Amino acid sequence: MSKVIGIDLGTTNSCVAVLEGGEPKVIANPEGNRTTPSVVAFKNGETQVGEVAKRQAITNPNTIISIKRHMGTDYKENIEGKEYSPQEISAMILQNLKATAESYLGEKVTKAVITVPAYFNDAERQATKDAGKIAGLEVERIINEPTAAALAYGLDKTDKEQKVLVFDLGGGTFDVSILELGDGVFEVLSTSGDNKLGGDDFDQVIIDYLVEEFKKENGLDLSQDKMAMQRLKDAAEKAKKDLSGVSSTQISLPFISAGEAGPLHLEVTLSRAKFEELSHTLVERTMGPTRQAMKDAGLSNADIDEVILVGGSTRIPAVQEAIKKELGKEPNKGVNPDEVVAMGAAIQGGVITGDVKDVVLLDVTPLSLGIETMGGVSTVLIERNTTIPTSKSQVFSTAADNQPAVDIHVLQGERQMAADNKTLGRFQLTDIPPAPRGVPQIEVTFDIDKNGIVNVTAKDLGTQKEQKITIQSSSSLSDEEIDRMVKDAEANAEADKKRREEVDLRNEADQLVFATDKAIKDLEDKVDAAEKEKAEAAKEELKKALEGNDLEEIKAKKDTLNEIVQGLSMKLYEQMAQAQQGAEGAASQDDDVVDADFTEVKDDDNK
């Protein structure tokens, strides 16, 4: 089998690796660097990728950076009169990495394992797979970045069981995953993250500070000057990196602008203390998902054996200090944060080709999946942090008599009401044979494959007719939405609970009205007319209460009607028991027992 390369398709930088002699090896690009900037530039019809594109970004407005932040959305880049989707731009980066691997291996490469942030949703994963396809790669597997990092870290440590926290702060995304390693099994226990937080944001606080300082001194706003801003971005990124090793750095940008008196220069000394003050809220934002992942895994700080740092931004001293303070543990510095993800992807490639044996990877889905049911409730079929691949089925029914079709509204998120979650897709199961409500059996099955991509099937168990949907990128979750869902779910837990209770109460009351009608019809002349009238009156009172918003009244009327219906049922049961004693002799001669409505049979008819 041909080699399966491992690709870390990053927001700021990308990396490619391959398995050689059972060990992952990072492949250097033609410039001799082991990572390639995720930058694409267009100039006079020519496309440039990587270092060469980044170098001319200052003078070329047709330069695209951080495209990963737009994956899974309908965002478009308009360049030289042509529109490009994020998938197409990402494909150009992938093609560059593919060419690097082919040059090193001396053979054509067609297969790859590509990594994505653990908190990437279905649309973003689909978009990544599409980018691979555009680049001429068969994407054998999409795996989560923290999981890939753990794979690279733990490949030679499978002899002992340990729990590992992977803290992955990249250029544009942030993930925390907790894994259990042992006997070659890499099992993800929980994952959390923020898809709008990364090294770019740390650069931005320095840029904002420099713009402000220059404005104070010269009265000019550099944020309106595109070329000046590109120079500031480069300087900010360099200063951020410098401050990981020194306590102070000089930012010097001559001829950044011009005033009435001539050229203006930017000269600022930035201390590490000032940078930490500017980026304090960003560092604090990384702690929320860290605590959430620990809570979801049900672990305390003492349970964590190792903390692995992934992504260049984890080199920031304040980030390392915050992790140490939060978890009470010194992070492991034995892995290269820029390369470890690609190395893990290469190992997964080796697992696929059979070159790596006795390694099993068990990943999880980051958000709950379900469908909308009666009353606008979100009924979860697959909980978040469920190990994938997985499949889950549940049987539902119709809400009205002779209902010919059901709408399946597929949802992703943590809220209790459908309207508060993200719509992944909708489809319809039609041609349901006429039947009373509650009789048809509709089986809904959710299937998540090893790449975290969702398929939903609805099947009428009566007719065996089924309808399927594969969730497509068009219904994508934006980067902000996925993080907002979990936060909203926590903030609105109490309100959600009350709304859910109200819907449940109304559904129960509605069901009781339906059951009462059926019971009165079934009883016919078997009980007193007065008792039937009493049940009818209580039913009408409940229906009237349901038209209003007084939940206490609905509950009281429901309880009253429930008591009456139970009383009627008891009387009917007693009558049936007496009749059964009379028919016992005849019934005992029949060996076949059939569950059915009881019908009194006269002895004469049986002779």
From Swiss-Prot:
CDD domains from the xrefs? ASKHA_NBD_HSP70_DnaK-like
Job of this protein: Acts as a chaperone.
Query: What is this protein identified as?
Result: Chaperone protein DnaK
Where composition is biased (Acidic residues), the residues are 589-598
Region Disordered, as annotated, extends over 577-607
Give GO terms: molecular function aspect only.
Answer: ATP binding; ATP-dependent protein folding chaperone; unfolded protein binding
Q: Does the keyword Chaperone apply?
A: yes
Superkingdom field: Bacteria
Q: Which UniProt keywords apply?
A: ATP-binding, Chaperone, Nucleotide-binding, Phosphoprotein, Stress response
Q: Indicate where the modification Phosphothreonine is found in the sequence.
A: 173
Compositional bias ranges of the Low complexity kind: 577-588
Induction text: By stress conditions e.g. heat shock.
Top-down, what is the taxonomic lineage of the species of origin? Bacteria, Bacillati, Bacillota, Bacilli, Bacillales
Per the UniProt entry, what species is this protein from, by scientific name? Macrococcus caseolyticus (strain JCSC5402) (Macrococcoides caseolyticum)
**Signal peptide as annotated in the record:** none
What family is this?
Belongs to the heat shock protein 70 family.
Q: Which PANTHER family does the record match to this protein?
A: HEAT SHOCK PROTEIN 70KDA
